[in-house]
Amino acid sequence: MLDNVDVKIPQHEKGNLAENSLGGTELLSMELFRRLSQEYKDKFQFIVSRVNDIEENKRRIYWLHDLALDPVHSLLTTPSIDLFDKLVFVSHWQQQQFNTLLKIPYERGEVIKNAIVPIPKHQKSETKDLQLVYASTPQRGLDVLMASLDLIDRTDFHLHVFSSYSLYGWKQNDEPYKHLFEKCESDPRVTYYGAVPYDEMRNHWKNMHILAYPS
C-alpha cells in the first residue's frame, strides 16, 4: 500500500518503527505534510509519536499519539523535555493524562484534535439490514464484539470487520488473533476484509450505519 504514497512523512524514514505503516497517525501526518508549505518544513522538525533523531538546527514539535505511560515518553520526565519547543496532543483528555501521570505542565503543550477529510454527501445503498463496522486492530475489543453478536436480540444486521496488523507492516502480530479472524470468516453475519487501502475503506464507510467499537 505504500507504493501509492505521494508525500514524505517522518514515520516513513528508514529505521522508524512505523516505516511501513499506513495507520491513522500516518494518514494524519500525510494530510498535514501535503498542506504544509516548505518554509515550515525547513524551520521545524516534526516528531510524530517516537523520537528517532534530533535535528539540531530546527525548532522541534513533538506530536503525541500514544498513552502517557507508553515507555517511549520516558524522556519527557527528564530534562530532555527541553529538547522540544512544543508538545501537541490529540485530545484534552490525553493532555490531562500527561499532566497527571507525568507532571507535564499544561503550558508546554497544545491540543489539536484528530480529523479526517470529510466524506462527501451521498446516498447509502438500500438495505433492509443495519450495517455495522469495526475498523481497528484486533486487540481493541474485536473478541468482545464477536461474542456480543449472540446477545443481540435481533437479526437485521451485518458486521463488516477491517482488522489486521498488516496495515502497520506487522503481519506477524496477527498470529495470536488468527482464531478470531477465522471466527469472523465463518460467521454468516460477518464479512472480514483484513487490511485494505484507505480510499477503499472510505468507500465502504459510505454504506455503514453504526461504528462498533467496544473497547
Predicted features and spans:
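Active-site proximal beta-strand in glycosyltransferases
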Residues: F44-P71, D85-F89, E110-I112
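Donor nucleotide-sugar binding/catalytic pocket of nucleotide-sugar-dependent glycosyltransferases
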Residues: D85-N99, I104-K121
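Glycosyltransferase donor-sugar binding loop
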Residues: H158-P176, G194
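Nucleotide-activated donor-binding/catalytic signature segment of Leloir-type glycosyltransferases, i.e.
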Residues: D174-D199
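Acidic donor-binding loop of glycosyltransferase active sites
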Residues: K206-S215
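Membrane-proximal helix-turn-helix segments that form the acceptor-binding/catalytic region
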Residues: L67-L87, H179-K183
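Conserved donor-binding/catalytic core segment of Leloir-type glycosyltransferases
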Residues: K124-G141, M146-L149, L159-H160
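N-terminal pre-catalytic "stem/leader" segment of glycosyltransferase-like enzymes
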Residues: M1-I54
